[in-house]
């Protein structure tokens, strides 16, 4: 276990180094950040003086070394627009994004498992064919188009749900969230469905394929021959083994969904980190852009490590000790 953790920590450091290098390298290709700091009336000489003061004219290696030194102390720079530490700005918006990810994850879990299991148990039924056709269509539709269609149907035409914003929030034990109000939950529905549409078809197919593989195994056939109840075979034995790879993929996709929130949050004007990232690009707020990329990369690294560790604990056949079996 210790060897595994050390190995994963070393891999995580390498990945974060590469991510930070790429994130920092793209800063020079995003435009001039001074456009948000000074007005049009400022002379070129004053602009150059400000660039020197901010260190924008320094060589790349000098700027990157300075950035890494500050990052190791938890400082990823100060946002040009908000005039606050970039990490604080991201953390302020993170709660809204996590609400969206939780809502989408809830929908995915509640739909993919029963639909995938049913499709595996009844592979030739009409409903299974309908589910598979729907998942094929769902994979091919981009998330922004799904979001626009949902908004048009349920907000504009039917008027059932709000079309944009986070809605009313309430504070509970220091946690400011829309989960605690009906208005906040109503605002969460459409963005959550749109975000879930990215992963839901994939998870339905994943659960179905894993369940089919388990159902074709020898111990399932032996259980049927022994006369065990089919429900016990399907839901007590087969489903448990089906969930192992689903857990692995699902954990990794949590980090993916945080990154995928950019388009969903933009369409619904959801005040999360994805919407913040696009605004930072438009404003050429390079410290905030770099901090966001590194933050999302960190989420990927942490979730992958946790999933690998949990999978090794749940499935004893997986070797995480670094020793031979």
Region locations from a protein language model:
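Membrane-water interface segments at transmembrane-helix boundaries in multipass membrane proteins
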Residues: 133-141, 145-200
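N-terminal signal-anchor/signal peptide hydrophobic helix marking the start
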Residues: 6-16
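Hydrophobic alpha-helical segments of integral membrane proteins
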Residues: 9, 46, 50, 60-76, ...
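An internal, D/E-rich "acidic patch" concept
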Residues: 57-113
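Residue-level signal for discrete positions within transmembrane alpha-helices
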Residues: 12, 93, 97, 133-136, ...
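Alpha-helical transmembrane segments of integral membrane proteins
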Residues: 2-3, 94-127, 143, 175-325
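Hydrophobic alpha-helical transmembrane segments of membrane transport/permease proteins
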Residues: 15-65, 154-180
């Amino acid at each position: 276990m210790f060897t595994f953790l050390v190995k994963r920590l070393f891999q995580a450091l390498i990945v974060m180094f590469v991510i930070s290098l790429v994130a920092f390298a793209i800063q020079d290709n995003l435009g001039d950040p001074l456009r948000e700091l000074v007005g049009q009336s400022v002379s070129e000489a004053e602009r150059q003086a400000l660039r020197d003061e901010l260190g924008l004219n320094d060589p790349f290696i000098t700027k990157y070394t300075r950035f890494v030194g500050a990052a190791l102390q938890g400082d990823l720079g100060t946002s040009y627009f908000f005039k606050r530490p970039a990490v604080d700005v991201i953390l302020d918006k993170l709660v809204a994004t996590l609400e969206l990810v939780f809502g989408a994850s809830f929908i995915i879990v509640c739909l993919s498992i029963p639909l995938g299991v049913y499709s595996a148990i009844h592979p030739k039924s009409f409903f299974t064919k309908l589910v598979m056709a729907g998942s094929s269509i769902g994979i091919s539709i981009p998330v922004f188009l799904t979001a626009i269609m949902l908004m048009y149907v349920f907000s504009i035409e039917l008027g059932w749900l709000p079309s944009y914003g986070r809605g009313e929030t309430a504070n509970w034990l220091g946690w400011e969230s829309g989960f605690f109000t009906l208005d906040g939950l109503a605002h969460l529905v459409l963005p959550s469905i749109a975000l879930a549409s990215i992963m839901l078809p994939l998870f339905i197919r994943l659960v179905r394929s894993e369940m089919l593989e388990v159902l074709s195994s020898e111990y399932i056939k032996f259980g049927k021959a022994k006369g065990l109840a089919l429900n016990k075979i399907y839901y007590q034995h087969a489903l448990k083994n089906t969930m192992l790879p689903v857990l692995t993929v699902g954990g990794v996709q949590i980090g993916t969904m945080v990154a995928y929130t950019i388009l969903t949050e933009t369409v619904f004007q959801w005040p999360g980190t994805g919407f913040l990232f696009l605004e930072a690009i438009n404003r050429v707020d390079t410290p905030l852009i770099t901090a966001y990329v590194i933050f999302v990369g960190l989420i990927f690294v942490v979730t992958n490590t946790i999933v690998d560790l949990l999978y090794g604990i749940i499935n004893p056949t997986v070797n995480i000790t670094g020793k031979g079996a």
